[in-house]
Amino acid sequence: MAVKKISKVQPERFEFDPKNKQTADRIIQNYPQGKQQSSVMALLYLAQKQNDNWIPLSAMKYIAKYLDMPYIKVYEVATFYSMYNLTPVGKYFFQVCTTTPCMLRGAYNLVEVCKKKISEEENMLSKDGKTSWLEVECLGCLLYTSDAADEITG
């Protein structure tokens, strides 16, 4: 599996829009006093949703300030979990598990299909900008790997 990539093109600023700011405040209120930093995952998801399904570095810095926590802690969470996208993704976004059990069931066939049909490298948008793909850790879909490859390749 490849190292999680950070987009080279980054917006300078990010802040929650008024609706998401209200949502963030409601989320934070669900945590006991002194434990509000535990809402970091929910706020990262909210930022990703607001920013076309990816999280720029400026959003991580904003969330760190919003939660009064070190930026590196937000960065660690965002880079650890595959549910957070750190590069722009297409409307159609494929995640392919390439851990050993899935590899044995044909996951690399799916990777080859993605390379041919979407883009040569993961984390890159297709030529039309609508589709992207990424290698990830286990998705819990081991039974479907070869079926998916057959369905995609015809």
Model segments located where?
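Ferredoxin-type iron-sulfur electron-transfer modules in oxidoreductases and energy-metabolism complexes
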Residues: 6-46, 51-94, 98-146
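Acidic, Mg2+-coordinating active-site segments of isoprenoid diphosphate-utilizing enzymes
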Residues: 2
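Single conserved hydrophobic/aromatic residue that forms the stacking wall/gate
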Residues: 144-147, 151-154
